[in-house]
Curated annotation (Swiss-Prot):
Induction: Transcriptionally activated by HilA. Repressed following invasion of host macrophages. It comes from Salmonella typhimurium (strain LT2 / SGSC1412 / ATCC 700720). The keyword Transcription regulation applies. The lineage of its organism: Bacteria, Pseudomonadati, Pseudomonadota, Gammaproteobacteria, Enterobacterales. This is Invasion protein InvF. The gene is invF. InterPro entries: Homeodomain-like_sf (IPR009057), HTH_AraC (IPR018060), HTH_AraC-typ_CS (IPR018062). Pfam families: HTH_18 (PF12833). Gene3D superfamilies: Homeodomain-like. Keywords: Activator, DNA-binding, Transcription, Transcription regulation, Virulence. Residues 129-150, 177-200 bind DNA. Residues 112-210 form the HTH araC/xylS-type domain. NCBIfam families: PRK15340.1.
Length: 216
């Protein structure tokens, strides 16, 4: 297989199935047939943005290659999203030099940066229109970008993120209901309580009491 980008050319021998990550490169078979299946990397970019946001791995900037070729042991992992995510997490724990290059490529993608931006804004209480203006694109285009990066509707995703973060703080017991509502972008304590109850079936106060009883 031949890779070409600008004036740089490189050949690579592929005897079995392989996974190719590439950025704006021309790929062509030198001999034989090339059978390929495109895969959406937004799932991996999103997962990586969460991991990096939690500070779980070293994100020191590294210059990425224009393409990276991996040969996973089990090709079946790419047939199932959960298997794919599990494989990805395993690789992050003990990354090979080649996989570190994959991470560098993913960190250059717009989906990765957009998910990071949305995570940072998830408790701001800003509307999607306000976020789009801050991001510098039209509301319609911003929704389209978010849908592609998140794999679903951004409004629902942000709502769930905000709920998760506020519940973690509620369970830890560091803030009262009013503080939680203000700090996580809810319009009022009643708005906070009603939304949590709508999403998980119990109020945050009741959930906190249940957890405290379980700890005794």
């Amino acid at each position: 297989m031949s890779f070409s980008e600008s004036r740089h050319n490189e050949n690579c021998l592929i005897q079995e199935g392989a996974l190719l990550f590439c950025e704006q490169a021309v790929v062509a078979p030198v001999s034989g047939d090339l059978v390929f299946r495109p895969l959406k990397i937004e799932v991996l970019s999103k997962l990586l943005a969460f991991i990096d946001g939690a500070g779980l791995v070293d994100t020191t900037y590294a210059e990425s290659d224009k393409w990276v070729l991996l040969s996973p042991e089990f090709r079946a992992i790419w047939q199932d999203r959960k298997r794919c995510e599990y494989w990805f997490l395993q690789q992050i724990i003990t990354p090979s030099p080649a996989f570190n290059k994959v991470l560098a490529l993913l960190r250059k993608s717009e989906s990765y940066w957009l998910v990071g931006y949305l995570l940072a804004q998830s408790t701001s209480g800003n509307t999607m229109r306000m976020l789009g203006e801050d991001y510098g694109v039209s509301y319609t285009h911003f929704r389209r970008l978010c849908s592609r990066a998140l794999g679903g509707k951004a409004k629902s995703e942000l709502r769930n993120w905000r709920m998760a973060q506020s519940l973690l703080n509620s369970v830890e017991g560091h803030e009262n209901i009013t503080q939680l509502a203000v700090n996580h972008g809810y319009s009022s304590p009643s708005h906070f309580s009603s939304e949590i109850k709508e999403l998980i079936g119990v109020s945050p106060r009741k959930l906190s009491n249940i957890i405290q009883l379980a700890d005794k």
